[in-house]
C-alpha cells in the first residue's frame, strides 16, 4: 500500500513510519520537513498535499496541536487554535481525502486518553480528542467505496515524558504505540477508537 503519514517527524509518527515501511510505501509528511509539508489548520494546504501525494491507499495522522492549561486561563484563541488544528485539521484530512483515496482504503486519526481520562488543565485537549472520536464513529457510517476510518487513542509516550524531564516508565514507548496504527491500517476495524495501551508488551 501507499500510505501517507502526517506528523512523520514527531515521536509517534517516526515510530509509525518505521513500523510500516518494511511492507508498504510510506510518504512522510511534516509541518516543515518530510517528503511533503502540510499545515493542518489550512484546508487549502491539505488539498495541495493530496494533489501532490496522490494516489494513496491510506492516510495516518499522528499530528495536531492543542493547548494545555487551566480552564480559567485558556483564552478564546487557545480554544480556537486547538479546534482549528488538531480537531478540524484531522476532520479535513478525511473530508478532502475521502473522494481521492483508493477503494477500500483507510484513515487513521489520533486522539488521546485525555478524552476519557481528563486531568486538570486538559479541558481544550479533552474537548478536541472527544470530538475526533465522535466524528470517526459517525463518519464510518458514510465512508464510500469500502473506505474505513479509526482513531488511535495513545497514552503519554515514554519518549515525550523523558524529554519533559519526567519518568518515561510512566508512559508507553512509541514503538509499542505504533502497533495500534499498524492494526488500523492493515486490519478490518471501522469506526473504532483503538486504545493503544492494548498493544503494550
Regions picked out by a protein language model, each given a short descriptive name:
Residues 40-56:
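Conserved Rossmann-fold cofactor-binding substructure of NAD(P)-dependent oxidoreductases
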Residues 137, 145-147, 151-159, 164-201:
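C-terminal helical subdomain
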Amino acid at each position: 500500500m501507499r500510505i501517507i503519514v502526517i506528523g512523520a517527524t514527531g515521536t509517534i509518527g517516526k515510530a509509525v513510519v518505521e513500523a510500516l515501511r518494511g511492507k508498504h510505501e510510506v510518504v512522510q509528511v511534516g509541518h516543515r520537513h518530510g517528503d511533503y509539508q502540510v499545515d493542518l489548520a489550512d484546508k487549502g494546504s491539505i488539498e495541495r498535499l493530496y494533489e501532490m501525494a496522490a494516489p494513496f491507499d491510506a492516510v495516518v495522522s499522528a499530528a495536531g496541536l492543542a493547548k494545555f492549561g487551566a480552564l480559567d486561563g485558556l483564552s478564546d484563541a487557545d480554544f480556537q487554535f486547538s479546534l482549528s488544528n488538531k480537531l478540524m485539521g484531522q476532520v479535513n484530512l478525511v473530508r478532502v481525502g475521502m473522494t481521492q483515496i483508493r477503494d477500500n482504503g483507510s484513515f487513521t486519526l489520533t486522539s488521546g486518553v485525555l478524552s476519557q481520562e481528563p486531568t486538570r488543565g486538559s479541558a481544550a485537549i479533552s474537548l478536541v480528542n472527544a470530538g475526533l472520536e465522535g466524528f470517526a464513529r459517525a463518519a464510518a457510517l458514510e465512508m464510500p467505496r469500502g473506505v474505513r476510518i479509526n482513531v488511535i487513542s495513545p497514552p503519554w509516550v515514554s519518549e515525550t515524558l523523558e524529554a519533559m524531564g519526567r519518568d518515561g516508565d510512566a508512559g508507553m514507548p512509541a514503538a509499542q504505540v505504533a502497533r495500534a496504527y499498524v492494526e488500523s491500517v492493515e486490519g478490518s476495524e471501522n469506526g473504532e477508537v483503538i486504545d493503544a495501551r492494548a498493544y503494550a508488551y
